[in-house]
């Protein structure tokens, strides 16, 4: 997001460093998913440890009231405590994604904040940009606040923002790959140009990946596999919380310039012994 490129002053406490998505404002810049955990208990414990405020839910794969005979995720992740972010994971065309968002709005009593993802194929889970653009327009016209999963193409990101998407969510690398941020330069271009929040979505594997995303100037990071697939998900959730915080603080502080040659830390004059 372009207005985040200046460094913070000492009069800007990090505790007051919020960000706004559509009509909602948040303090935690870590967003988490709910899939791949071994059970509901682990899901709740890990999400609690992350201190996330936004929790994303795959409507086509997770019961949030569609089936009264199955455990309801909302019994563990309460909408009274978290902002539930329905997503369209598993959708491969605009029509299915639109229908899924409308179902989510019905199940959540008119909730209009959604995460749109329209996938290209099952092997890469790379975004289908054309179908994403098509779905985004319909949803925005229908009153949804759309956070959108997309490629790392700065031109596509600008188009989605121009359409009215409230957050741009470029992938760091393939969903669930844990490969980290393979595209830092293009991510930086998206961040510099954007006037809405930019959040890395997909590819984070460990805490350093999250910190790097925030150091680049991202407004937040969304992850699921990096926590759920860890040997200790609750501990990893805590690590990610601290990594996002540290990366954001480093960005606001302003890193030192990179130099090709050494620069001594101590003065080069006034030696005791010549």
Curated annotation (Swiss-Prot):
Gene Ontology MF terms = thiazole synthase activity
**Where are the coiled-coil regions?**
none
Subcellular location per UniProt equals: Cytoplasm
Q: Spell out the GO cellular component terms annotated for this protein, sorted alphabetically and separated by semicolons.
A: cytoplasm
Keyword Transferase in the entry? The reply is yes
Q: Which residues form the active site?
A: 115
Please provide the record's keywords in A-Z order: Cytoplasm, Schiff base, Thiamine biosynthesis, Transferase
What Pfam families is this protein classified in? ThiG
Give the reaction(s) catalysed: [ThiS sulfur-carrier protein]-C-terminal-Gly-aminoethanethioate + 2-iminoacetate + 1-deoxy-D-xylulose 5-phosphate = [ThiS sulfur-carrier protein]-C-terminal Gly-Gly + 2-[(2R,5Z)-2-carboxy-4-methylthiazol-5(2H)-ylidene]ethyl phosphate + 2 H2O + H(+)
Query: InterPro entries from the entry?
Result: Aldolase_TIM, Thiazole_synthase_ThiG, ThiG
Its pathway, per UniProt, is: Cofactor biosynthesis; thiamine diphosphate biosynthesis
Q: Which Enzyme Commission number(s) are listed?
A: 2.8.1.10
Q: What class of enzyme is it?
A: transferase
> Which residues are 1-deoxy-D-xylulose 5-phosphate-binding?
176, 202-203, 224-225
One of the GO biological process terms: thiamine diphosphate biosynthetic process
Q: What is its main location?
A: cytoplasm
Q: What does this protein do?
A: Catalyzes the rearrangement of 1-deoxy-D-xylulose 5-phosphate (DXP) to produce the thiazole phosphate moiety of thiamine. Sulfur is provided by the thiocarboxylate moiety of the carrier protein ThiS. In vitro, sulfur can be provided by H(2)S.
Q: How does it assemble?
A: Homotetramer. Forms heterodimers with either ThiH or ThiS.
Family that this chain belongs to: Belongs to the ThiG family.
Instruction: Supply the HAMAP family for this chain.
Output: ThiG
- The name this protein carries in UniProt is Thiazole synthase
